């Protein structure tokens, strides 16, 4: 239960209409986006932290002795997440070990600066940090990918590679739980995106606070599921937290922006629409699919490491034949994208060579001409 913090200092006379609606003692400095409640800074800190604690406890997200990796990008969400989790872990004795896990996508002028923020957070919060790069995992950076495949599909590549990179980074650390800073706005946007795209398969699980791929030992949780983005920004501002606020240079091309604009228009009319959309997503249930017949045992091959290779069908826990990552197909999505990139790079190089050869031939022809 939330209890308004007491102020040891002598109260100052303030108009009743300007008083905090919770403690009725201090001046209100903000209006909460989700319920338009006017509250003071101290009460905001308490209610914000209490709501996140209640979300963690009610969903049984953490277990004593567990090691968790916080996906740290240096942005407002992950910075506040790391700060609040450390605070609540100390205050309520969750008994978990927190590690910062960052992904370096290789975006010059964006990720290099944000990683500098993460490194400062590591010192400020006294937490261990692990950085995993696209270049080390895939031998590509996002800048190289965009130069090769164009900017329009950049978020598709980055989304697939980033999810796999987080899992690989966690596995490297021996951690089976990754915590991300997805907030209520992100969750509502995802619901709208899946509706607009007609993506029924993802719609049902788009509001899950705890997810885990079939056969994967690594689970993911979102303690900020019910926390509004505006409140996260205000918390970071009032707490004077060190975070990186520049948007990714490739983000404007993302389809998510369409859902975000739609939601902003809805929120202007109905402030509670973000939570309403999440609750609607939670209520959605798809009709159960007909169970598929299991493939004959002769189609299975057990590898020395215990993973399963199938010729035709898929069994939960199967691994990509190229990289060993969990996949519902013989070749995982990341490897398929990498194959397309390599083919495109070879094509681009061939075109460059042809252009160079053509220019050289034209130059030799001109040299032979006599005027």
From Swiss-Prot:
It comes from the Eukaryota. The keyword Phosphoprotein does not apply. Keywords: Cytoplasm, RNA-binding, Transferase, tRNA processing, tRNA-binding. Pfam families: ATP_bind_3 (PF01171), zn-ribbon_14 (PF16503). Pathway: tRNA modification; 5-methoxycarbonylmethyl-2-thiouridine-tRNA biosynthesis. One of its GO terms (biological process) is tRNA thio-modification. Its main location: cytoplasm. GO terms for cellular component: cytosol; cytosolic tRNA wobble base thiouridylase complex; mitochondrion. It is an enzyme of class 2 (transferase). InterPro entries: CTU1-like_ATP-bd, CTU1_C, Ncs6/Tuc1/Ctu1, Rossmann-like_a/b/a_fold, TilS/TtcA_N, tRNA_thiolation_TtcA_Ctu1, UPF0021_CS. Its EC number is 2.7.7.-. GO terms for molecular function: nucleotidyltransferase activity; tRNA binding. Belongs to the TtcA family. CTU1/NCS6/ATPBD3 subfamily. Plays a central role in 2-thiolation of mcm(5)S(2)U at tRNA wobble positions of tRNA(Lys), tRNA(Glu) and tRNA(Gln). Directly binds tRNAs and probably acts by catalyzing adenylation of tRNAs, an intermediate required for 2-thiolation. It is unclear whether it acts as a sulfurtransferase that transfers sulfur from thiocarboxylated URM1 onto the uridine of tRNAs at wobble position. Prior mcm(5) tRNA modification by the elongator complex is required for 2-thiolation. May also be involved in protein urmylation. This is Cytoplasmic tRNA 2-thiolation protein 1. It comes from Kluyveromyces lactis (strain ATCC 8585 / CBS 2359 / DSM 70799 / NBRC 1267 / NRRL Y-1140 / WM37). The gene is NCS6.
